[in-house]
Swiss-Prot record:
Modification Leucine amide, positions: L31
Name by which UniProt lists this protein: HCS2 neuropeptides
S-S pairs: none
Reported tissue expression: Expressed in regions of the central nervous system that are known to control withdrawal behavior. Detected in the cell bodies and processes of the command interneurons (at protein level). Predominately expressed in the LPa3/RPa3 and LW/RPa2 giant interneurons that are located in the parietal ganglia, as well as in other unidentified neurons in the pedal, pleural and cerebral ganglia.
Binding site residues for Ca(2+): D146, D148, D150, K152, E157
Species of provenance: Helix lucorum (Snail)
């Protein structure tokens, strides 16, 4: 009797695995139906919750008729040209003045000219960085580390830039 129960359980388990991973061709996509996740629409893969290269309008369900203008929202990922994969933090928009001021201030700091307002006197003549001002945004670090200005960050540029940053801003 034990062998018959084990054979029945094995048959049920293998049957459910086959039903899950080998569905009918025109069945609704479920787990294991690879073509649903890898089919291409035009020249890019389907993305959930991201805008396409042409831009789309965002309609809020609680919005009134007069509020249905085109709402643009820039997310973490900025869309590349012609529907390509998004690149992190490299949008083609014009940089604002605040961003340029912050960038130039941090570039001066990394080149050796430290700002005194970011440092605090310990009382014994030594100085330390304020805890809230120890981070620099990644876009500014990318521009600062890219020494040959080709728009690509090589391993050597990253290592030398990181060494310069650690000398200017110790982590303790």
């Amino acid at each position: 009797m034990q062998h018959q129960i084990r054979a029945l359980l094995l048959f049920l388990l293998s049957g459910s695995a086959c039903a899950m991973f080998y569905p009918r061709p025109k069945d609704y996509p479920r787990l294991g139906k690879r073509s649903f996740f890898t089919t291409v629409n035009g020249n890019h893969y389907p993305r959930i919750g991201r805008r396409d290269a042409t831009g789309s309008s965002l309609v809020l369900p609680e919005a009134d008729y007069t509020d249905l203008g085109d709402l643009t929202k820039r997310g973490v990922f900025t869309q590349g040209a012609h529907g390509s994969y998004p690149r992190v933090g490299r949008g083609g928009a014009v940089l604002s003045r605040d961003y340029l001021n912050e960038r130039s201030k941090n570039l001066e700091k990394m080149s050796g000219d430290k700002d005194d307002d970011l440092e605090v006197d310990n009382g014994d003549g030594s100085r330390r960085l304020q805890a809230g001002h120890s981070g620099i945004p990644l876009e500014i670090l990318f521009i600062a580390y890219d020494s040959d200005n080709d728009g690509k960050l090589s391993k050597e540029e990253f290592v030398t830039g990181l060494a310069q940053y650690q000398m200017q801003c110790p982590l303790y």
